[in-house]
Regions:
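Conserved NAD(P)H cofactor-binding loop of Rossmann-fold oxidoreductase domains
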Residues: 9-14
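Active-site-adjacent segment of SDR/Rossmann-fold oxidoreductases
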Residues: 47-48, 64, 85-95
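Residue(s) in the substrate-gating loop at a strand-loop-helix junction
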Residues: 59
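Substrate-binding pocket helix/loop in short-chain dehydrogenase/reductase
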Residues: 17-18, 25-27
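SDR active-site lid
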Residues: 92-152
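Active-site helix of classical SDR
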Residues: 41, 75
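Active-site loop immediately N-terminal to the catalytic Tyr-X3-Lys motif
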Residues: 19, 66-70
């Protein structure tokens, strides 16, 4: 077989402090978001040829540690880092790797993630249309971009975490 495009979009998250979440939930996030993505990518790579594409769904959570979303954000940081490294490794074979890093998207994700049953207001305000997110990610992949960030607010967030120290941003976002 000749695989021209693979999309790794499986993943889940659980919101809550580490000690409040079940260990199985946390290790499950690592298994699905990191191990499964790596395994699928590794299994398909031998069947990919020149001008093939790999689109890995990370998250804007990959850009900054997230209290109460710690394991999820860490797994998505893994996806982003792995995708960037893989893009360099596969460059000589002309296989292009893109990490899609959307913010909150209107899917059933938060039905599973939000353990309190309430989606925070700021997340509801910036929720993106899933079709638009996918369309942008596919377009960015076809253009050979290594990172796809959807929407102006997430692009600003992406720039802020590059400019300001993470501890400063975290203190603003999560001050109690």
């Amino acid at each position: 077989p000749d695989v021209k495009f693979i999309i790794n979009g499986a993943g889940f998250g659980k919101i809550g402090e580490t000690e409040a979440l079940a260990m199985e939930e946390e290790t499950g996030m690592v298994d699905v978001n990191c191990r499964a993505l790596t395994a699928v990518t590794r299994l398909v790579l031998p069947y990919m040829s020149e001008n093939s594409r790999i689109l890995q769904f990370a998250s804007a959570a990959a850009f900054l540690p997230q209290p109460r979303f710690a394991v999820y954000a860490a797994t998505k940081s893994f996806v982003l880092s792995y995708s960037r490294a893989l893009a360099m490794e596969l460059k000589s074979r002309q296989i292009y790797v893109t990490a899609a890093c959307p913010g909150p998207v209107k899917t059933e994700f938060f039905d599973i993630a939000e353990t309190t049953g309430e989606i925070p207001l700021y997340k509801r305000l910036v929720m993106a249309n899933p079709k638009k997110v996918v369309k942008k990610a596919l377009r960015d992949s076809m253009m050979g971009k290594r990172v796809s960030v959807y929407g102006p607010l997430m692009k600003v967030f992406f720039l802020l975490v590059k400019v300001f120290p993470h501890d400063f941003i975290l203190s603003l976002l999560f001050s109690a």
